[in-house]
């Protein structure tokens, strides 16, 4: 690892326990900051309720650190939206937000659309499939943003649960997922070595300043986190990044074929930022004996949404007015 990356790791890595909520409340008040937690979700009815309840109880009702909690539903076919709303989240269907801009399917699309309805100066994003986690995920991600104005993006990292050698004993290891270790981390070490010390470069738990995210183009799918990391580094440098150890995280796992599509999206994002020609249409062909002919063509979302600040001058003014008028806590939504 290059010296610059090692020095960044030593200077910009903290633990969630370094950021007690009492300290954060003082800093939030002194900066007149507003904090939104946003959960992009699709078919997460089994987990979304518990996530929403914990954030509301610990960080809205008990402390007031978080001002609003939004679930952006991305074409769920289950009861994700109803469960989230019933447990106290403001719920929006991604396709219903600014419909004049059309709609894509994907996590990045939900995040891009969230910028039109969230009102926070600081945005914290969590995945909707978490099963082992805590509200310290939010406080940890907020901490560096409230304490250092140079920090623009905070990445969470954690130990993941893996099966033990006997196949049934769970153990925690400080590793990324399969796509992280086989795709994202090798890419960063080979082409962006200053970012080699980012432990979870494509993890779904991160905090960001609103002004930064509004200025970036957003891939509509799973290339989101890689693009935000690379573009933040490109525009603001390594010192604009920080990371926080969140402890242990457990979530629902995807099939290898689904991860293949994710890997293709991340590689496309990286190639674009290496100035390769963009793919107008991308397809991943995967072999599957269960289907006739053996091959399945999976579309790979490669579109990117433009920076929110570029789509409408009028939007920027409306958003500023909306944030100024917004109530401190919202308990209902669409």
Whereabouts are the PLM-identified features?
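Short aromatic/hydrophobic "clamp" motif used to bind/position activated sugar donors
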Residues: 123
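Terminal low-complexity segments of carbohydrate-biosynthetic enzymes
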Residues: 1-9, 254-334
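The conserved acidic donor/metal-binding loop of glycosyltransferases
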Residues: 127-133
């Amino acid at each position: 690892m290059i010296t610059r990356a090692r020095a960044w790791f030593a200077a910009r890595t903290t633990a969630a326990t370094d950021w007690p909520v009492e300290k954060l409340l003082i800093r939030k008040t002194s900066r007149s900051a507003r904090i939104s937690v946003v959960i992009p979700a699709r078919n997460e009815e089994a987990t979304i309720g518990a996530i929403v309840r914990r954030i509301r109880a610990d960080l809205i009702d008990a402390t007031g650190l978080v001002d609003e909690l939004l679930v952006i539903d991305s074409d769920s076919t289950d009861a994700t939206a109803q469960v989230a709303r019933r447990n106290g989240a403001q719920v929006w269907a991604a396709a219903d937000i600014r419909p004049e801009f059309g709609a894509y399917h994907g996590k990045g699309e939900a995040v891009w659309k969230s910028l039109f309805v969230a009102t926070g100066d600081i945005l914290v994003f969590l995945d909707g499939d978490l099963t082992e986690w805590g509200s310290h995920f939010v406080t940890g991600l907020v901490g560096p943003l409230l304490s250092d104005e140079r920090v623009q993006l905070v990445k969470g990292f954690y130990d993941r649960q893996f099966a033990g050698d006997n196949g049934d004993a769970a153990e925690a290891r400080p590793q990324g997922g399969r796509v992280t270790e086989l795709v994202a981390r090798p890419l960063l070490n080979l082409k962006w070595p200053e970012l080699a010390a980012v432990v979870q470069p494509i993890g779904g738990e991160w905090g960001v300043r609103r002004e930064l995210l509004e200025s970036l183009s957003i891939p509509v799918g799973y290339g989101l986190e890689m693009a935000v990391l690379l573009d933040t580094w490109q525009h603001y440098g390594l010192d604009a990044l920080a990371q926080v150890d969140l402890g242990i995280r457990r979530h629902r796992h995807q099939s290898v074929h689904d991860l293949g599509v994710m890997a293709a999206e991340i590689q496309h994002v990286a190639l674009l930022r290496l100035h390769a020609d963009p793919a107008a249409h991308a397809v991943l062909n995967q072999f599957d004996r269960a289907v006739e002919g053996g091959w399945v063509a999976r579309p790979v979302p490669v579109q990117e949404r433009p920076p929110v600040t570029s789509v409408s001058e009028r939007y920027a003014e409306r958003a500023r007015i909306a944030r100024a008028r917004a109530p401190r806590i919202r308990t209902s939504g669409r």
